[in-house]
Amino acid sequence: SMDELKNFRQWNSLTPGHPEYGLTPGVECTTGPLGSGFSNAAGMALGAKMMGSRFNSSDISLIDSRIFVLCSDGDMQEGIASETASWAGHLRLGNLITLYDSNDITIAGDAGLAMSEDVGKRFEAYGWHVQHCDGHNHDEIADCLEESLSVANKPSLIVAKTVIGKGA
């Protein structure tokens, strides 16, 4: 709601600066530095794959989960995100789907101050399935998510191009 957005980065709100497990509904792990949530998600994806290989059989698929993560320009600037993306591509974690909000803004200002590469091409080089969409178009996002769900042998990156504050 708009009331919650007005409480952005405030303690005990639904929109804290650093959401914490157990305090913010829907948050499955606490992160700290930028990029660490992305790395946590890749670890969860590997964990799900490992559990599936142990407990699934040809008759029963007990563990068949997808791990979804939201990332920002600030996340993608961090070294930990590059290392994780390379590792996830190498392991072919097809159950990892990343929605990247590419709005060219970080907390420090314009993302171009610290990053000039094409993130989608970087992820393609790491072996990821990469798609692009208008991040303000729900149908395009849904189509990209649907396609990502059909890719079993590569992690997926959806580069959702947005304009910060659009419609506010």
Model-assigned labels for residue ranges:
Residues S1-E4:
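Carboxylate/His-rich catalytic cores and anion/metal-binding grooves
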Residues K6-R9:
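N-terminal core-entry segment
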Residues L14-G17, L23-A168:
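Glycine-rich ThDP/TPP pyrophosphate-binding loop and its adjacent helix/strand module
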